[in-house]
């Protein structure tokens, strides 16, 4: 992962793994300069030292391998989607209902909580299932992109 987007792994209703933010407040917290209760309101809470699209190459951090079990929930979200909630609230919402129901509800709550200062909201979640291999037809997959923005293709140089 990179920056302050987070990956959560949830097993049996409990947080199994959470990635470490690449932010100034995370470093300050690890160094004992601030308390955990200060993180959400600290003036530097949105300053990241590694990100995609910045002037410098990102510091990509690979988490330790964690074997998944049937029923585990994996969620990847931007800071706009996780910041309005405590980790316990986010974990509870994703652990007690299907991701298909939890994700839209969490995004709506995050948007309302942020108000006119709403950051980008991205939250993707899935529940792991054992032994089910699914083949998806490319045409079928592409037909389900009505709310997805396709990447802009670079122009080809005609020289």
Question: Which residues make up each language-model segment?
Answer:
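"…together with the soluble PPM/PP2C metallo-phosphatase catalytic core" -> "…together
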Residues: 2, 8-69, 118-125
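C-terminal catalytic subdomain
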Residues: 50-77, 81-159
